[in-house]
Amino acid sequence: ASFAEAPPGNPAAGEKIFKTKCAQCHTVDKGAGHKQGPNLNGLFGRQSGTTAGYSYSAANKNMAVNWGYNTLYDYLLNPKKYIPGTKMVFPGLKKPQDRADLIAYLKQSTAA
């Protein structure tokens, strides 16, 4: 199923998901340093593997994914299947509602 078929996302619910499943390795704060994973500020419209100052896997650089609603929706289902060789150890979010909520939060919170 694609993002077009996903339920509407709830940013408040997405923030809770981010805090429990993503914030250990990522931040969304503009100007903040990288953690275990890259800072996600400015995520939408950016190409994978291009955030300055973060050491990406060759897989993330070579995939050259342009991050947006559709690519994030597919990636967050199963990151290691979407980008084989990624350093991200997160197994993914199986529920379409969880992915839609997280993407709604990321769209709001990462606007540069």
Curated annotation (Swiss-Prot):
Keywords: Acetylation, Electron transport, Heme, Iron, Metal-binding, Methylation, Mitochondrion, Respiratory chain, Transport
Signal peptide bounds: none
SUPFAM superfamilies: Cytochrome c
Phenotype upon changing residue 112 to S: In 50% of the molecules
One GO CC term, this protein: mitochondrial intermembrane space
Pfam families: Cytochrom_C
The record's account of how the chain is modified after translation: Binds 1 heme c group covalently per subunit.
GO molecular-function term, one example from the UniProt record: heme binding
PTM-bearing positions, type N-acetylalanine: 1
Residues with the N6,N6,N6-trimethyllysine modification: 80, 94
InterPro entries: Cyt_c-like_dom, Cyt_c-like_dom_sf, Cyt_c_1A/1B
Cell inner membrane is among the record's keywords: no
Binding residue positions for heme c: 22, 25-26, 88
Location(s), subcellular: Mitochondrion intermembrane space
Function: Electron carrier protein. The oxidized form of the cytochrome c heme group can accept an electron from the heme group of the cytochrome c1 subunit of cytochrome reductase. Cytochrome c then transfers this electron to the cytochrome oxidase complex, the final protein carrier in the mitochondrial electron-transport chain.
Similarity remark: Belongs to the cytochrome c family.
PANTHER family: CYTOCHROME C
Name this polypeptide is given: Cytochrome c
Species annotation: Acer negundo (Box elder)
